[in-house]
């Protein structure tokens, strides 16, 4: 069992997942530096690099983003149906400079490097992840037995329908879909398809470099991605965000709403539960070990180095 703490401020949101009194996960989002992962843009091919089998894509940001041929969806190459590892069609035969593409960010920019992109779009819902360019039904391995997964897959295939009948598309069932009714799954399917239809409609009406779809905020992703049956409580120290999250959860994650609590204490929520101290210890350059030795961790743009020192360890 675990608890989730949300510390909200106008400039920054921090989320800590606490299990057995220790911080197991820490998530941070700055208002002016929101992550781009999951965002969908209408991009324009700025340059094709055959030697690197990649292309630079202008998505309206300061630096051009990067698209590798392996992340380029095409009807002629499907990695899931490619057991022989047949190489994909060369990128210079698939895209050209000036071409517009609907792309999704899969990795945020770092240092001087632009964002990493994919044209294989995925849209996360409450119980499902929609893969509009695919026809695969995937089931989380965390869901029950093989028999339960097979039953869910059969139900989903019926609900999804056939492309020629207006259905189709690929879906991955998240862990919270295990106990979902057909009505709940059907509602999520309809919501995700509607979202994709709106994205496609915007892509036809907007110029290249336009943001077509933005992923949920960190506070909302707590309910979608972090809250599970193992969550005992979700405490948030902002009344405004508590009310907004409750309204959001009532529609998309009703089972998690009952676990929401507004923290009203005078002490900062992260201080009260010892999170600040754990953060400082985790981010320290030096990490002391029980044996008497210690680690020195340094991060550069290219790599992270870990220097192991014996210190007071004498065997």
Predicted regions located by residue number:
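DE-rich acidic low-complexity regions and acidic surface loops
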Residues: 1-315
């Amino acid at each position: 069992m675990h608890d989730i703490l949300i510390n909200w401020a106008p400039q920054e949101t921090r989320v800590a997942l606490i299990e057995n009194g220790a911080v197991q996960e820490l998530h941070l989002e700055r208002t002016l530096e929101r992550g781009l992962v999951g965002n969908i843009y209408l991009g324009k091919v700025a340059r094709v690099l055959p030697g690197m089998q990649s292309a630079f894509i202008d998505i309206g940001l300061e630096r051009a983003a990067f698209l590798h041929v392996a992340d380029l969806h095409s009807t002629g190459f499907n990695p899931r149906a490619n057991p022989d590892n047949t190489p994909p069609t060369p990128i210079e035969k698939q895209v050209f400079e000036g071409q517009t593409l609907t792309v999704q960010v899969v990795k945020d920019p770092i240092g001087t490097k632009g964002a990493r992109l994919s044209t294989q779009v995925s849209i996360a819902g409450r119980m499902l992840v929609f893969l509009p360019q695919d026809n695969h039904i995937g089931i989380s391995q965390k869901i029950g037995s093989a028999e339960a997964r097979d039953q869910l897959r059969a139900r989903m295939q019926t609900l999804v329908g056939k492309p020629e009948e207006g259905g189709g598309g690929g879906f991955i069932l998240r862990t919270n879909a295990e106990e979902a009714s057909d009505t709940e799954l059907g509602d999520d399917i309809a919501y995700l398809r509607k979202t994709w239809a709106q994205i496609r409609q915007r892509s036809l009406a907007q110029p290249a470099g336009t943001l077509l779809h933005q992923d949920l905020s960190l506070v909302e992703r707590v309910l979608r991605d972090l809250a599970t049956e193992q969550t005992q409580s979700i405490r948030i120290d902002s009344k405004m965000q508590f009310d907004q999250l409750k309204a959001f959860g009532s529609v998309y994650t009703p089972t998690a709403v009952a676990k929401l609590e507004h923290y009203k204490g005078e002490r900062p929520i992260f201080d009260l539960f010892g999170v600040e101290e754990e953060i400082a210890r985790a981010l320290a350059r030096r990490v002391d070990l029980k044996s008497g030795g210690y680690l020195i961790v340094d991060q550069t743009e290219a790599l992270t180095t870990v220097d192991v020192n014996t210190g007071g360890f004498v065997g």
